[in-house]
Amino acid sequence: QDLPIDKIYTSALRRTHQSVKGFIEKSLPWEQHAGLNEISWGNKEGKSPNTEDDLYYKNLTKTWREGNVHVQSEEGESPVEVLERQKPVVEIILSRPEEKAILIAMHGRAMRVLLTHLFNAPLHHMDNYAHQNLCLYHLQYDYTAQEFRLIKGNCVIHLGDLPESM
């Protein structure tokens, strides 16, 4: 929380707001964008995981890794749909070069989709971007070259000795 941040961008989901509450409480400029929301897992959303759901998830993510990124979760979204709703938010963010240091808070699968887009990687490579809860991806954008550079990925050192249950 000691980083100099010009703006906070979050999804519209309450859990994301809770994750960056300390920054929000500092009265930093903050925008919520539903385009940054986590992928909709459809009829699997919010259910307690069980063996059947775990198998479904593993098979679905395998399908995506094989390049079938248009496949939706049952009654939910595909990675392509997530990316399409993220693109306008990225355009907004990049249109504001005066915001030198920004914090984007979002959930795991949506973050993986976003990172593939920012690094011009194929969407089916989204699982190459590992993540843990509350991890940090530190990126730098070069407006001249119009490209992102990875400074740190999947970093959790800022969490210190937080309990596992957080």
Regions found by a protein language model. Name each.
Residues 32, 39-53, 95-100, 116-166:
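Acidic, low-complexity terminal tails and accessory targeting/binding regions
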Residues 10-11, 84, 105-106:
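Short beta-strand scaffold positions
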Residues 1-6, 91-92, 138:
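A short, N-terminal amphipathic alpha-helix
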Residues 16, 85-90:
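Alpha-helical packing segments of well-folded alpha/beta enzyme cores
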Residues 1-61:
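Phosphate-coordination/substrate-recognition cap region in phosphate-metabolizing enzymes
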Residues 22, 113-117:
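Active-site signature of alpha/beta-hydrolase-fold catalytic machinery across serine-
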Residues 100-108:
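Generic beta-sheet signal
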Residues 59-81:
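Short glycine/proline- and acidic residue-enriched helix-loop micro-motifs
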